[in-house]
Structure formats: C-alpha cells, structure tokens
Amino acid sequence: MIPVESRLPFYSAVDTSSRENGMATAIKDANQARDIKQPKALPAPNSDFYELAETLNPAERSLVKQVRAFTESKLAPVINRYWADDAFPFELLPALRELKIGGLGLEGYGCRGGSQKLFGFVMMELARIDPSFSTFFGVHDGLAMGSIYLDGSEEQKQKWLPQMARLEKIGCFGLTEPLVGSGAAGGLTTTAKREGDTWVLNGEKRWIGNAPWCDLSIIWARDLADNQVKGFIIENKTTPGFSVEKIERKIALKVVQNGHITLTNCRVPEANRLQAGNSFRDTARVLRMTRYMVGWMATGCQMGAYENALLYSQQRLQFGKPIGSFQLMQDLLAKMLANITACQCMLLRLAELDDEGKLTDQHAALSKGFCTARSRETVAWAREVFGGNGIVTDYNVARFFADAEALYSYEGTFQMQNLIVGKAITGFSAFV
C-alpha cells in the first residue's frame, strides 16, 4: 500500500526520509539490474505547485501543519478499514479535539475563528486523506454551527457554540428530503405548526450527515402559517417524535454516517427556533458560506489522488522502467496537477472575497461546480495510473474515485450551480 504523504517544504509534519530513501534505493537497484540509468533522487509529491500555502501567516501555517500531522499519523493508518466497514472512527475524536479547530471562521463563543482561507486549507487537508472525514467536520463546523452563528439568537449562540467548538456536542443539518433536493427553496414538505410556545414538526429528511449519532440537528421546515422556511434546533436524544435510521449500502463517503430523519408530531420549544432563520434567504446565507467549502474538499480529494498516483508511478516498473518515465503517464500527471492548481487559485481568491464580505451566491456556485467537476477528472486519471490496482482500497485511490462522485452532487448539483451562475451573468432565470 502506498501511504498518502506529501513532503511540502513548509509542512514536513512527518519524518519520511527513511521511506523516501528506501523507495529510491529499491527503484535504483531494480533498474541497475536492467542496466538502466536512474536519477539520484526522485522529486517528492507536491500538490501545492504554486506554493499557495505561503499566503498563510505563520500561525495559520502552524495550524495546517498540525492538521496534516493528525491526518497522516492518526487518520491515514485506519481510514481504509473504517471506510470498508461503513463506520466512523470515534477513536480519533479525542485527538481531533486537541487540535482546537472547532468554529473555524466564526468569531467569539469559544470558536477558533480565523480567516475563511484558513478554514479552506484545513478542509482541504482533511479531504486530502479522506473526503468523508472532512464531510463529517464540514457538516458540523460549517452547516450546523454556521446555522446557529448566522441565524441563532444571542442566547442560542451562548448555549450551543462553545460546546460545539470543543466538539463536545456534534451537530447535523437537515434540509434535504426524500423527494426534495434542488427544489428546497420553495418545495419543502416538512412542516412546522406553532401551538403556543411549542412548534410541532412533521416530515422526513434524508442524506443528513452525522445524523445517526450526533447530539443536535438543525432542521428546516415550512411554517404552515406563512409558508416561510423556519429553522429549529432539535436535541436528538431527548426529543419525542424524532427518530433516525442510518442509510446503508453507500458506495461513497462511507465514513461519514448519513441518516434518514423522521419527525412525527415532534414538539420543539419556541426557545429552540432559530430566531433569525425566518425564510429560505436565511438558510441560503448558511449555504453560501459552506458551499464553496465543498470546493476546498474536492480539491483535497484531488490532491490525495494525485499524490498517491505520483508515488505509484515512481515505483511501479513496467518494460524495465518506472511507469512515471513514460510520456503518456506524465501527460496524465501534469493534467491532474493543472486541475488541482486551477482549483486552488480559484478558491484562494474566493476566500479573500469572503473575508472581505464580498462573497455572492454566484461566486460560491461557480467554484463548487468547477472544483467538483475537475475532481471527477483528476481522480479518474489517478485511478488510470494504477490500472487494476486502482479498484482496491489498499491503494487509496479507489476511495477518492468514489467520494468525488458524491462531492459532485451534494450541496447543490453541478447543473444547479450553473443555473445560479447563468442567472447572474445573463439576467434571466432559467429555474423551473
């Protein structure tokens, strides 16, 4: 198995010198046996080709190095086993808590804070080893915490965000329904009816990440009184009428646990209604913030696939040579790196716009669509490098290949992203 480790100069979170030397020696010896000249040293995989990580300040770079150390020393050794078992690695939560990355991009309330650029780099690092683990964190930190941060009352923020920032309470985000995905803005079938100081919720939510085991759910429902979308905080384990069934037999994002939520006369106090979440526009504020984070995750997915493919090409011998020495293989690797670099540059600028308060729905939509589409290309080329070995998880690339398909679809399909952009640039709405 080829571990996913990159030795970028500023990262160098894990000492890989002995493994590098061993790989180079093995290739050299094999090639000398065939009387083939071999370079003294092979370049280490570097998926930050334009050194964009250098745009981070020293404190941010230090945190990203810590995240990489966690993913390479803790996550990488166990992820294939958990992925194969459709299970979540709860054993890693204590080490994840030690990183103190809860609440990235959110200020106050015990949150880590920091720039959206830093948040993006962290999401990219997590996805570089496993996109489904990064999805777990993105749902909690971006969607669940973001909903309370943007749409909650001061009291709700004080109550929930500190616990969530410490990863003591984990959240999920319930918008998608069995028959409602792209049409959520005007088509939610989950309803909310107010009865005094209580709301009665009925309906179903599907594909909800973290739902089978998390502590609280952000549920979006249509108010029967005014037909507007309202947001609610539901405490999963203590709310009657709330139930979750784990979705089984997934072929992608197998580590993040997705659930089918059923709400049957589920009674939620008014105190748990998101006080500033009174229409889908308020929901969209959260999605705007998190949607382009999927672009960072898709880019991390590409990075992991590319780095695995490059290492493999340097040590796999065919016709007496490393396959990385063949023109067709170098063409694939160069195209992969170009995709990654294009996505990184786009996302870096988008993070700057977000930090400046200039991020728009169309900005987020363009990046989400573009980066996830490029990810599908990149991981397909990476799998091609491995040949038959690319369809087993031992070599990691099969996970990236499968997960890229899910990233392409969730938080808004590619086609819906293009319609958002199309409306912005033409002035015409093509939505049905």
Where do the PLM segments sit?
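N-terminal glycine-rich flavin-associated loop
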Residues: 135-155, 184
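Short Gly/Pro-enriched turn/cap motifs at secondary-structure boundaries
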Residues: 179-183, 207-210, 222-223, 250-257
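Alpha-helical interface subdomain recognition
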Residues: 7-128, 139, 152-156, 163, ...
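A short, charged helix-loop
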Residues: 259-283
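A short core secondary-structure module
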Residues: 202-244
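Conserved hydrophobic/aromatic beta-strand scaffold that supports enzyme active sites
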Residues: 172, 189-191, 216-220, 231-233, ...
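A short, Trp-centered hydrophobic/proline-enriched beta-strand micro-motif
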Residues: 167-176
